Amino acid sequence: MSITTMKGVTSESPAEALSRFQTTGLTLNNPKDLYWMTEFLKEEFYDKGNYYYPIKTVCDGELIETELFCPFEPKLSPHYIQLYNSRDERSNLYAVPPKKTDMKKYNRINCEKMGSLMAPNSNYDDTEMVSLFYSMMYYLNDQTAHLKLPEEDIQPELVDELNDHVLQYLSVFLSIFKPREPQDLERIWNFLDFYQPYFKKVDGKIILHEKYQGRTPPQIGLIKKITGYVLERFAPKKNITQVIYEVIRYIKGIKQEIKIRGDKSFTLSLKEYDEFRDQVTSSPMAHSITDLTYDDFSYKAYMNPLFIKLEDLTSEIITYFNDVCTCDRERLDDDPFNSVFILRDLHSLNYVKSCDLVVKHAHDKLSKFLEIKQTLLKESTNENEKKAIAQMIKTREDSLIGYTIHEICCVTNGYARDHKPLMKDYLEKNIFKKLKATN
């Protein structure tokens, strides 16, 4: 596909798209526009061997102009338009009746966009499920938002309520877990860690103690939609242990975040920050779903220390890209969980230089990612294993470039957590120029 052949996807020629853009500008509330932006970035950067993508934003009045290195091919799912157009129906999952979903918040999360960019090769249902996992992460994470308040303003009952909700969510995920091997049961049981006392093992399953069964928490419809799909689509033929593992990892990370946020005097080194963020990045959950969609699947890869390192690097790179793009919002929120702030304080830098340093660290991590990729492929013992590992690595590569494009294309306020007017101006200027040249 190219800019000149986009009509097969968007049902509009370059001339028709240009005419529309000159009236509306680039937006995120017309799903066609994301195809034009993605294809433009692919042709102007990836196809020309330039893997440095521009980011233009502002932090505390400082102009941030940097480049995110990501040497993988940008692609948007062919199902994105259909996913976007069915979002009103999907939004019903996010509130317990009679309450209704806050569409302002739902639009800002824009999970269909993330899923379609970060899992572009999956079928419709699988792409929807990846999107739902990303939205689950945002909704769970937002339930810790009140912990950013001054310590004296934090309401203990809200902390208890969040813990109750988390137990219900964990219980639903564990209800679909039917271990194929005894070691799978023990792996999950041991990984529950400080949540273990709330659960018990009964007939090869892990269930929540009756006394902790609470009232129906928000987003339970979302959780049941995800677990029902995993149970029907994957559990009969494949080992779903990693899905459960990654959900527990993320939820444990939220608990750790609560603990850290409770200590307003905390400091983190960059190494400690990486280790913490490895636990509270949603991409491993989404990857565990996408991995299952392929015939070539290796559960034992998750036990390989090198593959675990590759997964962690993916999380860290996405986190660093996110930190650069969200630093102004998080500065205004007085949220210290950001590598830009850590390096700024450590080296007495301004925001511009700190962002540049974060981007450099991300580049170094991506170089390490590529080294590990080659080692994993070289060490594969047979062709089937090599094919499975290659596909699982490709899933992580798709996430990295998908997240990069996601941040670049935040061009509509209210349809992105971090609207970027400067990127909107950049994309409109260059896409309009390219479309005019095709006429």
Curated annotation (Swiss-Prot):
Mg(2+) 1 binds at N322, T326, E330. Pathway: Secondary metabolite biosynthesis. Mg(2+) 2 binds at E330, F337. Its cofactor is Mg(2+). Keywords: Magnesium, Metal-binding, Transferase. Its EC number is 2.5.1.-. SUPFAM superfamilies: Terpenoid synthases. It is an enzyme of class 2 (transferase). One of its GO terms (molecular function) is transferase activity. It catalyses: dimethylallyl diphosphate + L-glutamate = prekainate + diphosphate. Coiled coil: none annotated. Pfam families: Terpene_syn_C_2. Magnesium-dependent glutamate N-prenyltransferase: part of the gene cluster that mediates the biosynthesis of kainic acid (KA) and derivatives, natural products with neurochemical activity acting as ionotropic glutamate receptor (iGluR) agonists, thus being neurotoxins. Catalyzes the conversion of L-glutamic acid (L-Glu) to prekainic acid in the presence of dimethylallyl diphosphate (DMAPP). Can also use geranyl diphosphate (GPP) as substrate, thus leading to the formation of N-geranyl-L-glutamic acid (L-NGG). Belongs to the terpene synthase family. This is Magnesium-dependent glutamate N-prenyltransferase. It comes from Digenea simplex (Marine red alga).
